[in-house]
């Protein structure tokens, strides 16, 4: 790092705001945004620089980081799949669908009473915030052929455990592939690509409809193979079996297909009927088979990704339930059905109240309520899913829960190319850790981020180093991996302002905006960052009583969680989360 170009001290003065009042300040008293508050500004700002030039602390690189969506989880990836026993018959109804008969069969009452909270659904969400819009199928994956998935002669995805084994219909895989194709159909303007994306989505929907099982006045989609999970006791199935995740996601598929402009009116009617029939399955409890919905002993509603062999049992899987709940969102927005809203209310109430069962403080969250196995592969999905629950309900509680998961174990995917960490002048400790290999250098259950060595390095002036990973180290804080130079492969702890990742990373947009509270008699320095090469400005505020401000975003900005203020004298400033309290607790 010592050989890197010299970091020039920003020539603009570090702006110190004189004491006094803030006219039109962003912060207000009394928990509303309708009145102005008087904030005492410190006569001199605390020294935030602490060995680092102001031009680094108060500016951002031109391009910030992002929070990429990880690949969808493989529902069967950690289990063992096998052919059904000889002579096993996989039922299916088949035949022509009579939409009126399906509509008439929809239950008009809930399967049982369960806990709710009065959550409503935001039916006016921007397009990009709606379910599955963040997961387009790429053009390179429109005709997949991998070890686990391939297309059959009808263009339908088949799932196989390896190259040498015949494939099977796997409802969740087919549904998620189709939903991705629908999103890509919406996004692309290329006629050839639109045609193929729509063809793929239609093919998956047709297979589901053809293979449906009509039972208890509802549609179910069978899994035609045996499967068990070696770590989750009780998750063991003989064909045919059913999944609440597939049932809920199928509702999203049929509703979203019915809304496309490229289908015929006959198809539109069919897809709406398919959505009705599938929705009915979420109104059938566990008092008969098949079932995917039950109430636990505390009165909470569950949509079981993996229903148990007996009533009231199951894996109580968190991600599968939320993905299924998105189907209720789609169904209510399309139909206004009040039972769908009631089920949605119950499902999100369950997720809110079981958050502490999902969370593992300062580490990976748990996969399910029953076994509480931490899972690296699903933690980021939990973050994304709680973010969408916040958007759909408008509740700050889900936003706060998402923020908590980010703090516990932030997205550990590779940082954007060109990411750098700033180092203050002085002595720093570097660590050699035992991790998985490139490109993630992630946590491994056999390695546990074991410390292999340490090194003290001293810099006479502030410097920067390229980094490629930012993640939590087991039993420690957040660390960066240095990716080039004399210290390539060594890790250093995030410690603002001594060591921090430059730029905006892991951004989250809130809808509606949230409320930040400035506690009384606490000096808090807010920053309006300059672009690269331009030093930003600061305002240090202190209020005699608790004062509130609206914010629309949260991100890791130059190495610490911050919220973006949107009104009054602090408009455009970032305030540090922590000293500034956020709603939703």
Model-based region annotation:
Residues 457-494, 541-578:
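SH3/SH3-like beta-barrel superfamily modules
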Residues 445-460, 531-544:
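SH3/SH3-like (including bacterial SH3b) beta-barrel domains
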Residues 415-443, 501-531, 585:
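SH3-family beta-barrel domains
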Residues 103-118, 124-164, 198-220, 272-295, ...:
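Long, well-ordered core segments of solenoidal/helical folds
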Residues 5, 51, 56-161, 165-167, ...:
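Terminal, non-catalytic domain-edge segments
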Residues 128-166, 217-241, 292-317, 360-381, ...:
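Carbohydrate-binding/catalytic loop surfaces
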């Amino acid at each position: 790092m010592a050989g890197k170009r010299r970091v020039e001290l920003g020539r603009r003065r570090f702006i110190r705001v004189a004491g006094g009042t803030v006219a039109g300040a962003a912060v207000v008293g009394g928990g509303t945004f309708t009145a102005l508050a008087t904030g005492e500004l410190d006569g001199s700002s605390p020294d935030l620089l602490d060995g680092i030039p102001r031009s680094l602390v108060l500016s951002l690189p031109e391009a910030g980081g992002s929070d990429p969506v990880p690949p969808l989880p493989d529902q069967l990836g950690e289990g063992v799949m096998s052919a059904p026993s000889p002579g096993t018959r996989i039922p299916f109804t088949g035949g022509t669908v009579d939409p009126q008969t399906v509509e008439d069969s929809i239950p008009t009452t809930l399967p049982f009473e369960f806990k709710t909270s009065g959550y409503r659904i935001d039916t006016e969400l921007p397009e990009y915030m709606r379910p599955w819009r963040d997961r387009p199928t790429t053009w390179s994956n429109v005709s997949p052929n991998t070890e686990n998935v391939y297309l059959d002669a009808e263009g339908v995805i088949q799932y196989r455990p390896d190259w040498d084994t015949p494939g099977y219909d796997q409802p969740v895989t087919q549904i998620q592939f189709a939903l991705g194709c629908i999103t890509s159909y919406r996004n692309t303007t290329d006629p050839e690509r639109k045609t193929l994306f729509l063809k793929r989505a239609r093919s998956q929907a047709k297979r589901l409809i053809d293979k449906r099982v009509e039972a208890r006045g509802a549609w179910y989609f069978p899994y035609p193979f045996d499967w068990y999970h070696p770590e989750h006791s009780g998750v063991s199935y003989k064909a045919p079996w059913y999944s609440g995740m597939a049932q809920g996601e199928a509702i999203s598929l049929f509703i979203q297909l019915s809304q496309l402009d490229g289908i015929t009116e006959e198809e539109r009617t069919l897809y709406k009927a398919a959505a009705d029939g599938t929705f009915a399955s979420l109104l059938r409890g566990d008092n008969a088979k098949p079932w995917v919905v039950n109430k636990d002993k505390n009165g909470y509603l569950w949509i079981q990704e993996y229903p148990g062999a007996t009533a009231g049992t199951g894996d109580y899987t968190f991600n599968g339930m939320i993905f299924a709940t998105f189907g209720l969102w789609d169904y209510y927005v399309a139909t206004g059905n009040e039972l769908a809203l009631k089920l949605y209310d119950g499902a999100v109430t369950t997720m809110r109240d079981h958050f502490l069962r999902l969370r593992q403080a300062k580490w990976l969250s748990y996969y399910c309520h029953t076994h509480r196995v931490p899972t690296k592969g699903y933690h980021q999905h939990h973050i994304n899913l709680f973010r969408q629950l916040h958007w759909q309900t408008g509740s700050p509680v889900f936003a706060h829960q998402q923020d908590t998961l980010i703090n516990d174990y932030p997205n550990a995917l590779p940082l954007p190319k060109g990411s750098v960490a700033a180092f203050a002048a002085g002595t720093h400790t570097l660590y050699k850790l035992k991790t998985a290999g490139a490109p993630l250098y992630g946590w491994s259950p056999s390695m546990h981020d074991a410390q292999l060595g340490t090194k003290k390095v001293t810099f006479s002036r502030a410097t920067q180093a390229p980094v490629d990973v930012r993640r939590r180290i087991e039993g420690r804080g957040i660390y960066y991996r240095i990716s080039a130079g004399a210290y390539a492969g060594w890790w250093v702890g995030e410690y603002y302002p001594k060591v921090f990742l430059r730029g905006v990373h892991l951004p989250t947009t809130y809808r509606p905006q949230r409320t930040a509270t400035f506690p009384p008699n606490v000096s808090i320095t807010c920053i309006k960052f300059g672009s690269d090469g331009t030093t930003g400005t600061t305002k240090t505020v202190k209020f005699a009583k608790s004062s509130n401000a609206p914010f629309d975003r949260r991100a890791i900005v130059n190495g610490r969680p911050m919220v973006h203020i949107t009104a009054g004298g602090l408009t455009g400033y970032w305030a540090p989360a922590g000293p500034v309290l956020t709603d939703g607790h």
